[in-house]
Amino acid sequence: MERYIFRIRQDGLYILDINETNKKIEKIGKVLAKFEPEKILVVSSRIYGFKPVLAFGQKIGAKTITKRFIPGSLTNPNCEDFIEPEIVILTDPRADYQILREAGLAKIPVIALCDSENYLSNVDLVVPTNNKGKKALALVYYLIAREMLKAKGQIKEGEEPPFSIDDFKSKDEED
């Protein structure tokens, strides 16, 4: 993640390069546009990721997992919860380690929202972002959904999508 760090404050806080984040979001929107929405799996085991992930799934048509991931769901066809996505989006590769591992075994590409402390092993595309803050997660999932619709030609450049960032925020969030 070092290449995505803009600077380190005196108190030790890592500041990510927002230009890199923006480039990655645009690229990921184009990548996701190549997949049928129902073949995209979006996962968050972090509580602050639940609402943005569910909103993303609803607005785009992707499958979502916000409860405990059942081991074997990507690798064991005999598992009751077996699914075969073509691409996986993880809110936090550390918290969602089991699905990251299984996606690697099943040769499924992985997009991950990563903060400065995350490792990029088994991650194919990264979005450098704060993956623990509820406002940051709402914004990133909103932007990815918007860029995906742009890449599919469903909205024009400069046009707003048929949903707002508020759809991705938790009810308890204040502006």
Per-region residue spans from a language model:
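Ribosome large-subunit tunnel/peptidyl-transferase-proximal elements
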Residues: M1-P162, K169
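Charge-patterned, long linear interaction tracts outside catalytic cores
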Residues: I165-D175
